[in-house]
Amino acid sequence: ELADLKRICDNRALVLIEDNCESFGASHQNKYCATWGTAGTFSFFFSHHLQTMEGGMIVTDDQDLYDYMRSLRAHGWVRDIGDNSSLYTKSGDPFEDSFRFVLPGYCVRPLEMSGAVGQVQLSKANDMLDQRIVNSKIYHHFFDNVDYARTQLPTQNSVHSYFGFSFVLENNLYNRRKEVIHLLKEYDIECRPIVAGNFMRNPVIDR
């Protein structure tokens, strides 16, 4: 589907931005998820594949977008962008440019502590991703023998990174989700919706 989405966006001059917060390490057709579009987002919250306690990252190969995001990340100033950026052409005097603000920016730079934790996590990332795949095979082996749940399988030429293990209730468990959630909680098994659903139905859209 990523290839189809990319083709649709290219044909209609649309910008493809991938929410990849739960798919770190996943790939399709030997191309990492989050690299198919103009930009891709990742979350490094503590429950995700790679943890830095909080925060995340955005990846892009668009230099203009990169400069805009670097500026927005740090107060809207220009000290972190290139000398000849389309966003702003620097004067060449670092003293003058150090506090030149061109965007209504934020202060969302990662802390050094988060960076240190992230570097340690990154060194173990491949092993952790491999273990998630091993775990998924155990779960798939069990669910292959039941008729009350349909599991999510990788599509052809894809690698699944298993943020969690998702399934859809069917047959005698159809429409009994609350009962299943209650039972899982009794055994201290954490569960959540597969995704957030239609975001356009959230109250924030009305504001």
What are the language-model segments listed below?
Residues E1-L5, R12-W36, G40-S43, H49:
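Conserved PLP phosphate-binding loop immediately N-terminal to the Schiff-base lysine helix
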Residues L2-D4, N11, S27, Q63-R207:
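PLP-dependent aminotransferase class I/II
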Residues D19-S23, G55, M113:
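Generic detector of well-ordered alpha-helical packing
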Residues T35-D80, E112:
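Active-site PLP attachment segment
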